[in-house]
């Protein structure tokens, strides 16, 4: 009632196969799979890039702290 039954889905799938053919659907599935794979690799490379930027900014902050500490020590010695 109000929902799509399994039989309706099967009939729609059968009509789609008859209209497009299995070769066309197979190539479409391959294209879709390639797009998903490309999207996943782009997302993972973006995460790696962000992690590298975070570690670089932490190293920069640590370097600046060390410079500040060494300047303070130099002032104390004078």
Curated annotation (Swiss-Prot):
This is Sec-independent protein translocase protein TatA. Part of the twin-arginine translocation (Tat) system that transports large folded proteins containing a characteristic twin-arginine motif in their signal peptide across membranes. TatA could form the protein-conducting channel of the Tat system. GO terms for biological process: protein transport by the Tat complex. The chain crosses the membrane at residues 1-21. It comes from the Bacteria. GO terms for cellular component: TAT protein transport complex. Coiled coil: none annotated.
């Amino acid at each position: 009632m109000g929902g799509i039954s399994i039989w309706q889905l099967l009939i729609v799938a059968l009509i789609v196969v008859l209209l497009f053919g299995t070769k066309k659907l197979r190539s479409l599935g391959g294209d879709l799979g390639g797009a998903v794979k490309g999207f996943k690799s782009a997302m993972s490379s973006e995460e790696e890039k962000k992690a590298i930027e975070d570690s670089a900014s932490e190293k920069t902050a640590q370097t600046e702290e060390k410079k500040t500490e060494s300047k303070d020590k130099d002032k104390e010695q004078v």
